[in-house]
Amino acid sequence: MLKAVILIGGPQKGTRFRPLSFEVPKPLFPVAGVPMIQHHIEACAQVPGMQEILLIGFYQPDEALTQFLEAAQQEFNLPVRYLQEFAPLGTGGGLYHFRDQILAGAPEAFFVLNADVCSDFPLSAMLEAHRRQRHPFLLLGTTANRTQSLNYGCIVENPQTHEVLHYVEKPSTFISDIINCGIYLFSPEALKPLRDVFQRNQQDGQLEESPGSWPGAGTIRLEQDVFSALAGQGQIYVHLTDGIWSQIKSAGSALYASRLYLGRYQITHPERLARHTPGGPRIRGNVYIHPTAKVAPSAVLGPNVSIGKGVTIGEGVRLRESIVLHGATLQEHTCVLHSIVGWGSTVGRWARVEGTPNDPNPNDPRARMDSESLFKDGKLLPAITILGCRVRIPAEVLILNSIVLPHKELSRSFTNQIIL
């Protein structure tokens, strides 16, 4: 039997995802029409022998998370449970803390997936590679260009055996163009090195009597504390993929991930893609429209558009490279490009909401999304436009390269602004 663990983090993470993470936990943000981690769960559920999927994180189990878990269990006919950490424990601390739940039933191996990645999840190929070698740790790797590789965990492998000889998390100088995808397959024996790190933390004096210092020993970073330490010892191997992959750290990267997933729907879920029908809107490229959305027949949608539940799209609307969330309204003849329109927001007639894409360099096949700061030299860098929850944009204005926080009612145009 097999299990899967999805690391969803907590509210102290995902600050670059604001203001979108104000309304829902980042792992539940809709990407290509479904919550971000549903893509992970779908991939895990398709692996033969999968018996249980565990979510580990520090979020409070609110109504949204509870409803998602119930819906996932019904849809995939698998136990999907949430295990809440008592404190943020890092990428490995939760695995060690909940080791008994993970190992219950004696699984052959278990997948570990970070929630904030977009991928085609070649889990069956990883399982096949694991069964050939049966080493404790198998990492999924891909390639990046020299400059961008410094923003990731870098892997030096033996090209014949694929053993990880050296691992450095976000090195200061170039190490390798092979990077860590944040998707792993572990044997039960992989928890022993995590126990060693925990015991070493105790011996180093990080565990004290006061309750507030308890997470010190429990905090384990897989990348620095385990992978870097065990590289070159015959325990960690890498499985390379040339499939789709991207981190989802910012709202801009969510829009890029939506494009990747919508493109993949052509193979995996063609029923989710809208088709042009007589009397319906004009569809260009890959578009997702929730069944409850109301779209005027003269609207032009796509490519890379995702329209959520209860959305209203008026006559003559042009929508491209954008996500429109639950309950939003785009009135007649609005134009929305490279933007995310928040829950319940309204864009007035003849208004234009536009952002600047920060996609990877299309001329470099190994280019990845840049996770740069919002600011440079005190100025807001051009990026996608984000309208938070229940924002009202008046008629005939331009909102360009701006971020509007929730519950704002604007009265004029804005360019390169954060509207607080």
Curated annotation (Swiss-Prot):
Region C-loop: start-end pairs: 356-384
Residues where GDP-alpha-D-mannose binds: E85, Q247
One GO BP: negative regulation of biosynthetic process
A single GO cellular-component term on record: GDP-mannose pyrophosphorylase complex
Subcellular location: Cytoplasm
Record region (Hexapeptide repeat domain): 273-420
SUPFAM superfamilies listed in its UniProt record: Nucleotide-diphospho-sugar transferases
Protein name: Mannose-1-phosphate guanylyltransferase regulatory subunit alpha
Native species: Mus musculus (Mouse)
Lineage: Eukaryota, Metazoa, Chordata, Craniata, Vertebrata
